[in-house]
UniProtKB/Swiss-Prot annotation:
This is Uncharacterized protein PM0498. The lineage of its organism: Bacteria, Pseudomonadati, Pseudomonadota, Gammaproteobacteria, Pasteurellales. It comes from the Bacteria.
Length: 158
């Protein structure tokens, strides 16, 4: 299930032709590898960059409230750190590749992907993050999606 706010819908509509014609950057494809650490799923590059060897539940509960918030924080990265053109387009293409790989590797595990996009006088930026769905844990209230100041897409996978 995909949820988007009006800002994201407007941005996607502007980029629709580019999305259909474009090919995903190989730099982004290189990021599509996952690792499981104590039941948390991370992008492998984020696990390495953040030096995660174990998950300390006490630290997680103090800083992030729950494991979903922890995963969401660790897995967040800027698409624009890897591509300089067609940033939203590349974000959407990355989501498609992420989804294919996730469903192949983790067919029985649900996850939530969040993409945000900013296009203003400051610049064009996009973030991508995900977390595993867990009972009793929610880091985003969907009814608030249209109150978010940035363009946002939320997709539940599996």
């Amino acid at each position: 299930m995909i949820y988007i706010n009006q800002l994201m819908e407007n941005e996607i509509n502007k980029e629709n032709n580019n999305i259909k014609r474009s090919v995903i950057s190989s730099d982004l494809l290189d990021l599509l590898d996952f690792v499981n650490v104590d039941g948390c799923l991370f992008f492998k590059f984020q696990k390495i960059d953040n030096n995660i060897s174990t998950v300390d539940l006490n630290d997680v509960s103090r800083q992030f409230l729950d494991l979903s918030g922890y995963e969401l924080s660790i897995n967040r990265f800027h698409i624009d750190d890897y591509v300089s053109n067609n940033i939203l387009c590349q974000s959407i293409l990355f989501l498609g590749e992420f989804k294919r790989k996730w469903q192949k590797i983790y067919p029985d595990i649900k996850c939530v992907v969040i993409i945000t996009f900013q296009n203003d006088d400051v610049g064009r930026f996009s973030t991508f993050t995900f977390h595993k769905v867990r009972d009793g844990e929610s880091v985003f209230e969907l009814y608030e999606i249209n109150n978010i100041a940035q363009a946002i897409l939320v997709e539940f996978i599996n």
